[in-house]
């Protein structure tokens, strides 16, 4: 039994010895080596070369050491393994070095250089040894070159530009130490050429240093780069008061927007990329101090609080002017020979005290007309209106019942439906024709705009805030600064926020939106007081005063500021809709307010208006997710855009007196036959037709542009549609106002001029394009620029300042545009 086992044991021992002989080298060559000297040696599976280096390390001076290796034999298998053993660290790498790219592509590098991580010393001076071991499993000799150099410019200095070269297999890193009194610096890296793509990383002074393409993202902060990169570094994030600036060239350029290189279709065959070298320059400069933060915040508050001060001064002046006017009227009433009468509803012969807040006509046509024209003829009615008698406008029953003011009652008139058709389809309409409903009912109807948008704001803003906080947390934890598209050359961090200045500059939207709400509140209080006094101007003159839409506009402006600030916490492609959602709201509400001025009875309800805006936001989300280069999406959207334009045009042209049912096509053919074929006649409502034709031309053109060009920024394209329609309607309104013989008073005229100028400057700064998520993060950083205001705010921050002021001014224009009609009877105010 034992006899046959003995030869088996001998055979097993011999086999193990033969394998050990193959795996373990028989010779070890150890030699003392020197810096700045090139060693050309051979190595094989039976030989290990060990090089011993020593150098003096001092506590107050940091010196870099760089190992350069070049393998002269181009062989596919059995690479050389280099192991650098230091006091507190070990670095190993193989040559040829193989790095992986996208889709597991392999790239081969024959020449490799690595900078050694320097362990600290507590002694004043210390001699440290390190060893370079060279081994391989190749049975044949492999020739290599080894050189160890000192890096003289290893420590970067504040304000000094340093230029160097690097490749994917020859990464570079340098050390920076915070000077006394400096709490924050900005590391700027530039290059004259965009490619090859590179990565800039900021890492703590620890060993090992992650300086290869496949591990540079493991620790610290990093961002890809073409021509420009910048990272703001704070002392509080680095306990050692120092950090490494690591620069790595990537194996491929796709991360920076470049194309993939040609790759042979050979399985597991690495590609020799040759010489992908990049020349870069690094500059470390001091970032802004805490005084700049305080100055920026005070500047921002000062600008917008000055509007509050100006508003208070104007309110005081207006109050003084009204008191003076009241005093003069009292003197006139005391003097019978003056011939002026008190302009109150109960001062007209035969007129009853005010009841029910109805408007649109006078209870006693003859008496009230004479009194009003006489009292107002001296000033505000000096320009011409068509002289029409009010006798034809007989008294109407008041709708004063308090039984119900539900939404179902909004369209309730005391007239029969046929009378509604007769009134609203007249060729020439006045505001009195479309201001016949109960004022209390309309007041509640338009208040719903405010309460709905307040509810929408809460439910929309809370998840947005939560999401952007998560974005910022991910950026801070992972260090990946490619997630957010900042202007890194002017991004000032505060706490966990990476770009506090971009958030602070949105304060204007909130403060000016609040100021607008206060102005509307004051106007509403004054109007209600006038109603309680039975002031005839408030009861029967001017554009009917409904403030619900104004409250909604002010709330939307405040929410735009909040959501824009949320977007700028981490601006990128996926959350840009946060910045634009309430812009759609503002554009829609402004158009509704313009329409409501002359059509108070037939304006859209809050539910239908917000439902339409919700559909717009829904398409905005679809465009962000599916619209990029998707032809089918653009076809569907363009068709819906054109159909919606036609339906809205029909609704506006016929003042809502049409029906979308199964007989619509028959009625269309009938109109075409009677008005175009049988008898060619012009449109009944020429002014409305001109506006709608222009609107259709613009919207069809925008739809064609979107279908042909398919812009990547769908949210901005959708916003452009809304803004173009708003500007068209606003211009039409002003032109028709002047064409109707009305005038624009001084304050709204100043608001129009100043707002137009501010919008012009705002758009100039908006189109500077400091970053764009339509490109890769590295390409976006090519557009980054330094701060231009107080060394704290950039061009986009100035856009925030100016656009908030311009929006506030635009709201004031809408508020005051028809102040000249406050003493004009409503059946002398044209509808257009």
Swiss-Prot record:
Segments crossing the lipid bilayer: 294-314, 448-468, 500-520, 547-567, 606-626, 632-652, 689-709, 716-736, 747-767, 797-817
Signal peptide location: 1-18
Entry's localization field: Lysosome membrane; Cell membrane
GO cellular component, one term: lysosome
Protein name: SID1 transmembrane family member 2
Family assignment from sequence similarity: Belongs to the SID1 family.
InterPro entries: SID1_TM_fam (IPR025958)
An MF annotation (GO) of this entry: AP-2 adaptor complex binding
GO biological process: cell morphogenesis; glucose homeostasis; regulation of insulin secretion involved in cellular response to glucose stimulus; response to glucose; RNA catabolic process; RNA transport; type B pancreatic cell development; type B pancreatic cell proliferation
Record keywords, A-Z: Cell membrane, DNA-binding, Glycoprotein, Lysosome, Membrane, Phosphoprotein, RNA-binding, Signal, Transmembrane, Transmembrane helix, Transport
Chief place where the protein resides: membrane
Cytoplasmic side: 315-447, 521-546, 627-631, 710-715, 768-796
UniProt note: phenotype after gene disruption: Knockout mice demonstrate a statistically significant departure from Mendel's law, but there is no significant differences in their weights or appearance as compared to wild-type controls as newborns. At 5 weeks of age, male mice show reduced weight and size as compared to control animals. This phenotype is not observed in females. Mutant animals exhibit increased fasting glucose levels and impaired glucose tolerance, probably due to impaired insulin granule exocytosis by pancreatic islet cells.
Gene: Sidt2
Residues with PTM Phosphoserine: 401, 403-404
Residues forming coiled coils: none
The organism of origin for this protein: Mus musculus
Keyword Secreted: no
Subunit structure: Interacts with adapter protein complex 1 (AP-1) and AP-2, but not AP-3 and AP-4. Interacts with LAMP2.
